[in-house]
UniProtKB/Swiss-Prot annotation:
Sesquiterpene synthase involved in the biosynthesis of volatile compounds. Mediates the conversion of (2E,6E)-farnesyl diphosphate (FPP) into (1E,4E,8E)-alpha-humulene and (-)-(E)-beta-caryophyllene, and of (2Z,6Z)-farnesyl diphosphate ((ZZ)-FPP) into beta-bisabolene, gamma-curcumene and (Z)-gamma-bisabolene. Can act with a low efficiency as a monoterpene synthase with geranyl diphosphate (GPP) as substrate, thus producing beta-myrcene, (E)-beta-ocimene, limonene and terpinolene. A motif (DDXXD motif) lies at residues 296-300. It comes from Solanum habrochaites (Wild tomato). It comes from the Eukaryota. This is Sesquiterpene synthase 12.
Amino acid sequence: MAASSADKSRPLANFSPTVWGYHFLSYTPEISSQEKHEVDELKEIFRKMLVETCDNSTQKLVLIDTIQRLGVAYHFDNEIETSIQNIFDASKQNDNDDNLHIVSLRFRLVRQQGHYMSSDVFKQFTNQDGKFKETLTNDVQGLLSLYEASHLRVRDEEILEEALTFTTTHLESIVSNLSNNNKVEVSEALTQPIRMTLPRMGARKYISIYENNDAHNHLLLKFAKLDFNMLQKLHQRELSDLTRWWKDLDFANKYPYARDRLVECYFWILGVYFEPKYSRARKMMTKVIQMASFFDDTFDAYATFDELEPFNDAIQRWDINAIDSVPPYLRHAYQALLDIYSEMEQELAKEFKSDRVYYAKYEMKKLVRAYFKEAQWLNDDNHIPKYEEHMENAMVSAGYMMGATTCLVGVDEFISQETFEWIINEPLIVRASSLIARAMDDIAGHEVEQQREHGASLIECYMKDYGVSKQEAYVKFQKEVTNGWMDINKEFFCLDVQVPKFVLERVLNFTRVINTLYKEKDEYTNSKGKFKNMIITLLVESVEI
């Protein structure tokens, strides 16, 4: 029989305090008319260049790639879409290129845009045994392009699996001997390939790489720098508004046991969408993800089971009249939760979009039920569930099903009811993203969690059910992550249903965030190191013009 939670001590996690506090409260930068005018002028220069450069040319491929990597492609969505479609159509008629760099670059750009280009284009670079020709090892640019292209593979694309192995091996062997700028670019790619890179982080790093390239276009570089700084000011203002909201809620004092990570939550959502048109959605989503983080800590690292039962029930009811049944110390949090979604409804009602909030509530309730299920297992004499049962619940408690749905609520674009129904029914891309999030989170944090009273992680469940070592479990989970990325790629060009590409891109970007923050350790929980530096790079330090 389960022990009474009244007899148990609270499973305190002793999370580290906030790094930032209310630091961004005073950030209220203004975007000058001069800045905006300069960016607009440069934007038109490159819009014209995109339109006038022949689609079926090397110059066009390089221009699109450079614009995308510098983080300014959002200004030219229509022009780039039209160009890539034309490039894709032309490639079906004429595929005589034998330049590894160009073939790889075209392949990556076309697949990134959501078109299925066959990986057979790389057969010309292989021997009869299917191995890539050793003569290619002298072509550093070609190797790097093929390496980047290989990350757009789907399952069972053996030629791209071989490409990844071949390029990784050779790039790792030569990187230390490359010139400085090439060394930086190759090292960055080996650490974080383009497909897995947060667009904003990638842009900031590529600005420096591009600047050190002797052949750079100085106007394009200036455009990227000005645009980066102008966007940064917008992001700082948003974060200032959110900091004021967070300070007024006073969670840091009322709930000191929980991770105080408002700035880190904003960075997370900035990774999902950084463009100006998503400003409202970013602010809405940051509030939601900070609340989800709070609930995670409450269910996992503070509240007793006797407190969690009525709290979960109240959230499932989603009714202010249920507040009296909530443990007194959690009533403030319950009120805050209802207020966030009520404000969403009021804001969206002006545009006749308030029905979207139903789906956001649905997913938050589902997330909290998953947190509660884990608390039930722990309360039941630390019951260790079967791996498959735990995996199904853990895919939800990872939070990415909730995130994939809720991040769409505040966007300006039209989203049909069918798209919302599709996404809450856990399509492959959402399940793959959630699996990656859960697997990377568990690999990075399960040993720390086991140092306190905590339910078994997926890794412990897998080890117990299959009688394998921790290292074997790690290999299994890393394989799941790799497969998850290939499934995400597949959904971009193999979907049977009509889902807007920007919806798929949000899920992709959520996955990029987890890949960035949990690659080596749990940077979100331990936010004083690399995560702090990333925030400084994107939200504190401007780019020198």
